[in-house]
């Protein structure tokens, strides 16, 4: 879901 919301950067950073 995060990827669809555009929070991919946060996931990559470990958030």
Swiss-Prot record:
Origin, by domain of life? Viruses
Q: Which GO terms describe its cellular component?
A: virion component
Please give the biological process terms from Gene Ontology that the record holds: DNA replication; symbiont entry into host cell via disruption of host cell envelope; symbiont entry into host cell via disruption of host cell wall peptidoglycan; viral DNA genome replication
The entry's localization annotation reads:
Virion
Name the Gene Ontology molecular function terms of this record: hydrolase activity
Q: Keywords, A to Z?
A: Covalent protein-DNA linkage, Degradation of host cell envelope components during virus entry, Degradation of host peptidoglycans during virus entry, DNA replication, Early protein, Hydrolase, Phosphoprotein, Viral DNA replication, Virion, Virus entry into host cell
Coiled-coil segments on the chain, per record: none
Reported function: Acts as a primer for viral genomic replication. DNA terminal protein is covalently linked to the 5'-ends of both strands of the genome through a phosphodiester bond between the beta-hydroxyl group of a serine residue and the 5'-phosphate of the terminal deoxyadenylate. This protein is essential for DNA replication and is involved in the priming of DNA elongation. Hydrolyzes host peptidoglycans during virus entry.
UniProt lists the family membership as follows: Belongs to the phi29likevirus DNA terminal protein family.
Summary of subunit composition and partner proteins: Heterodimer with viral polymerase. Binds to ssDNA.
Q: What is this protein called?
A: DNA terminal protein
């Amino acid at each position: 879901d995060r990827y669809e919301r555009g929070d991919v950067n946060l996931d990559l950073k470990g958030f």
